[in-house]
Structure formats: structure tokens, C-alpha cells
Amino acid sequence: MAKDTTGRLRVTVKSAGRLKLSSKLWLERQLNDPYVAQAKRDGLRSRAAYKLIEIDDKYHFLKPGIAVVDLGAAPGGWSQVAAKRVGAADGRGKVVAIDLLEMPEIVGVDFAQLDFLHAEAPAKLLSMIGGKVDVVLSDMAANTTGHRKTDQLRIVGLVEDAAAFACDVLKPGGTFVAKVFQSGADATLVTQLKRDFVTVKHVKPASSRKDSSERYVLAMGFRGVPTTHDADAPMATS
């Protein structure tokens, strides 16, 4: 073991058998990531939970008693945070987690294993939760191909789909939070969000790895009437 620049002991993984270099580097990063260790201590399912905690600590959109939907929720770190903050376990708030994959139960969270892109998904969610929601969360990332431009388009396309879903299910004044990656490809997305929400900004939590282009788009104050087809709608300032 060696110490890193902060004085912490750093674990180095020796190459063993058929372990690929990419797997070795990923394992080293996981073993040396303080947020991974903290998540285990706090009983959280992923380090990503701290990103939502940081964003909400600053912008305060997860309020007790509100309704939240978490898209692409597995393994459930964001759903855990949302459930705790809105009081879902004691029935004050509601959280619905949606994913194509199965997800172990979380107290206070209703789970729907479905494709949010399906035409009937918004109606099914509204039926489950008993009306429109206050917050839509998305920490989803599109499958990548290794081709930079193709991957950027896939990533932005997924966020655009999540934003369209949010506009179908949000109450006026609602909030949409989604993972994006820094690139020029999301300009159209931001323009559209500024038509549908009062405030739109990018956020980079400290728990997001410094070497990652990952950041989050935070759209607050849903106007209540999606303007997808209104190209002449006035744009709000962020």
C-alpha cells in the first residue's frame, strides 16, 4: 500500500490471472474511493446516493410529504435518499422507482419493473401514485459503444426521453434532475428545458469523480404545459 496526496493509504491491485487492465483499474478506483466505503457504512446501495444528497442539500426540492419518481432506479441509492427525505416510510411522502431490472425492496418505495419509454408508462405511474408528482429523478446512463459522437447522442437522447416523461407526469412547479455528460450535444436539451421550466442549471457535486465529464441538469419550476412543439416560446434565464 502507498499513501495518496491526502495521506490516505492507497490500495494497489496486482495483476492476477486473466484480470484485464480496465478491470484492474476499476477495482483499484472502487477500493480507494472514500464514497464507496462511506456508502457501505451508511447502508446505501451506491455511492451515487451522495450526489443526490449534495444537490438536494443545496436546492431543497425533496420536501417531506411530496411525490417522487426515480427513473432507472436500480440499484436504488437515489430511491433510498428520496424515501428518507420525503418521509415515504411513514406514509407522509411517496416514492415510485422504475427500472427494467429487478430491484430489492426499499421500505416506503413502490417499485415498477417497466420501460418508462412505453406509451402506457406515464399513465401507469400516475395510477400507482394517485396523481401527478413533484419531482422526477434520473441517474440513468445510456449504454456506450466507444464511438464518442454516437455515445454523446445516445446519452442526450436518453435524457430528452426522461425530460419528456417528466413533462407528462409533473405537477406545475415540479422539479426534474438528470445525469448528463459535458458536451456540446446537450444544447438543444437545455433550450427545451428552459421553455418548460423556470430555472435550468448544471450542477457538479463534489462526490462526482473529478476525472468524469458527468454532471447533472437541474430544472425547477415546471410551467405545467410542455412546449415541445412550440419553437417560438420565450426562453427563461437560468
Curated annotation (Swiss-Prot):
Its EC number is 2.1.1.166. The keyword Cytoplasm applies. GO terms for molecular function: rRNA (uridine-2'-O-)-methyltransferase activity. Signal peptide: none annotated. It is found in: Cytoplasm. GO terms for cellular component: cytoplasm. It is an enzyme of class 2 (transferase). Pfam families: FtsJ (PF01728). InterPro entries: RNA_methyltr_RlmE (IPR050082), RNA_MeTrfase_FtsJ_dom (IPR002877), rRNA-MeTfrase_E (IPR015507), SAM-dependent_MTases_sf (IPR029063). S-adenosyl-L-methionine binds at G76, W78, D99, D115, D139. It catalyses: uridine(2552) in 23S rRNA + S-adenosyl-L-methionine = 2'-O-methyluridine(2552) in 23S rRNA + S-adenosyl-L-homocysteine + H(+). It comes from the Bacteria. SUPFAM superfamilies: S-adenosyl-L-methionine-dependent methyltransferases. Keywords: Cytoplasm, Methyltransferase, rRNA processing, S-adenosyl-L-methionine, Transferase. The active site is at K179. The keyword Phosphoprotein does not apply. HAMAP family: RNA_methyltr_E. Belongs to the class I-like SAM-binding methyltransferase superfamily. RNA methyltransferase RlmE family. Specifically methylates the uridine in position 2552 of 23S rRNA at the 2'-O position of the ribose in the fully assembled 50S ribosomal subunit. This is Ribosomal RNA large subunit methyltransferase E. It comes from Rhodopseudomonas palustris (strain BisB18).
